[in-house]
């Protein structure tokens, strides 16, 4: 009961403070109308922030009050001696105990699932911000993503930067970039930005800016992404000139040998793939691509563009919509996701533990990437992924960062010195370095 009383007192106190704050806000608005100088404008802005903060606190206290009342009702509800809940349809008690009550009031089944995001609305919203705040938010959600998500899970956060502002009646106010940090039970609206959607849209719109600033997700760093993109134009040019095992051209008698070789190159296969993609466009994504083309974004229009692999530098969870119709781009992202799974499998294999513990350390980046990308309206060409793996797989695995950078001989020597010293000063078993 004391909890309810305390919460009610807090609600009453905050309601009184809110009445006073709203009156002060009205006074400040009148003062700005009479004399719109900097002092009055700053006062108005401070009053608006105070009212907003009090409204948020009051709403929070009211939610807590509702939760407390609900808990109290559950605690005082009489229990059935048979152990069966009054509204349970079973005539005899189940062998399972009653678990949590899942509240589905907040779920709107009319909203599309998270896989069918409104990419046009999301793209227009993001393009409306300045490049500095977009790239800083990307850094916080990729390079420092794990920490940011952990600290803000279950909330809707706002990114603020001095370069992002808007003028309202001559008053300069911050223009916040909103990103929702969902939990597993959250239902996202089609136009709502989440960390995954934000990384996807920004990576697709601004790969050149990401490349210049070398913004990279840790999961891409450990698979050797920096090494892979170092000489990308030469790397992809050599790949395109290689013979493709999946092409069997119809050769007419008397065709020159040189022309026969050209018709079997990977470049020809990619041209055929481009023809397939050109027939499978989705109207909303086309609208986004046209809108982006009229502004600052630097989306690649070909896989041999210098910035093409940087589309995946921050590990988007699907192929960005702005380059999904570029032959080989969606498959390049799938190749990177397989490399992430391969590295995690290697790490799980070398750890000590039961088979079950090792399996838990494996990942399924590829399956997730495949499912999300194909939900955008295209089927990935597994043959292109296979070509990438045959060409670069061995090289990339050799450049994985496996958390063991010490030379084996050096490690053995250091361990021997540790063992010797521990034996001199203690009878305990020396730990491994």
From Swiss-Prot:
Stretch list, region Homomultimerization: 1-79, 100-125, 377-425
GO molecular function: endonuclease activity; RNA binding
Tree of life domain: Viruses
Leader sequence residues: none
Residue ranges of coiled coil: 4-71
Region (Chaperone activity): 1-100
Biased amino acid composition, Basic and acidic residues: 67-78
Region feature (Interaction with host DAXX): 377-433
Region feature (Viral panhandle binding): 1-175
Biological role stated in the UniProt entry: Encapsidates the genome protecting it from nucleases. The encapsidated genomic RNA is termed the nucleocapsid (NC) and serves as template for transcription and replication. The nucleocapsid has a left-handed helical structure. As a trimer, specifically binds and acts as a chaperone to unwind the panhandle structure formed by the viral RNA (vRNA) termini. Involved in the transcription and replication initiation of vRNA by mediating primer annealing. Plays a role in cap snatching by sequestering capped RNAs in P bodies for use by the viral RdRp during transcription initiation.
Free-text domain note: The N-terminus is required for chaperone activity and, in trimeric form, this region likely serves in high affinity vRNA panhandle recognition. The N-terminus also contains a coiled coil region, which probably participates in but is insufficient to initiate N trimerization. The YxxL motif is indispensable for the interaction with host MAP1LC3B. The central region is involved in specific RNA-binding. Has distinct cap- and RNA-binding sites so it can bind simultaneously both the vRNA and mRNA cap.
Name the UniProt record assigns to this protein: Nucleoprotein
Originating species: Puumala virus (strain Evo/12CG/93)
